[in-house]
């Protein structure tokens, strides 16, 4: 993942997205294949690689010369995967409520988790693991009905024919040696073919496209090649403009992104891969509130975990996923297969809407009890239910004037004893598809 997140990344993100991949790929042409992704809402990201051995930054630590390249690569000798249980991973992902998972097949360091024939720099040939780490995981995912995603770094700082290496030096310029670059593209496409043929992913999650242009990568050619294997393959937005959806990283947009499909990828602590010293864990409440906010704004959350070099998942991450799963089991009706919510200003919190627009879900963050307010609702409310319970709530209309078209304020009484430990969800059944008033008040 990218580490050079700058203070103004939100503005950069919004600016880039306004002119990036969505301008090259027609949303109408991919509407059907994107439906499962739009309904899925939650994915689990897994960063697993040799960087977990010393607990250092994945790839960037040698690129930025925090550690020498030889010392970085020596970590491969400690990567055992001795306690790797792909079925247990898949079961945990299922328990979380996630509908898809993305595993790092190869990060920027070039170390492949599968026995690629294009390079000996893989876990099968060069590490004590001596096994294909992808096959059992994707088999386990598919057995549980979870969509399979493959993270793949376009750039490869270890491959001798790739120009980039350290942050202040490069091997060559593409313009000076186009044949060498051509050899790298052959290598790149060979590995992509292996992944598509052997693991048949549902989603390709690219990274590392920023070092070269779309023409240099032959991004349109890569897209065409991948879709020849699977026309329904979903491709993320890090293919220099030739992806299907956008991928903001770590920073949550303040306003709703103006894109058909988007996915926030975020860590459970401060780092993507396993780092023993990083104990700054997000709480289950923080994760759930971020998740709800993403869904309310029409997006997905791709939540990251970083297994240890032996394949065990840190206890803190297991707890986060299980708590998230408990909440999803109770409140999933308001999340999965629903649409992003109503415009800001009508309700001070996240919302979602059913696909037929006759049900509105309100998310009460924190310990919100007493009266909550909904503004501008022109519909009649047939029933208000606390999701996951059989409790029905009373409400009243305040300020409705008979001669004015402006609807009154809806006040809902929420007793403390119905509150969820994390986020309470109210289900409002409406008399017809939702209609909101956005005009002026008064005369």
Set out the residue ranges of the language-model regions.
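Bacterial Sec-dependent N-terminal signal peptides
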Residues: 1-23
